[in-house]
Amino acid sequence: MSEIPGILPSQEMDAAIASGVISADLAIPDGQVQPASIDLRLSNTAYRVRASFLPGANATVADKLKNFTMHKIDLTDGAVLEKGCVYIVPLQESLKLPADTSGMANPKSSTGRLDIFTRVITDGAAEFDRIEAGYSGPLYAEISPLT
């Protein structure tokens, strides 16, 4: 990966995928890598939780889900998510970032047009949408339909 600070171009994203820095349950299709980003994909399960949360230092999202899950929803054939509810969905992609590489996430514009609030959570996170340098682990989406 580049020694120059800034956003990784698609060529470096492709190299990160090839080297296992970015990996996924299913192969990452070419169209998923954009000029300076990668589109993250939902897994087949959503967990309805009482409220939004961050795991905090030394805690995992999976451990928090054991305590906070109200319902488990199969997304395989699609599902309707309830307005005003909070869902946590594991993403297909995971990361093994080098110690000098961090990440940021932001929703696609289509989520705003659909009036859905989304953000990314990582294990040990104290902040949404920020992935600490050297992070190694799964990624999760918090999804809250607004209308």
Question: What are these language model-derived features?
Answer:
Residues 1-147:
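Non-catalytic terminal segments and appended small domains
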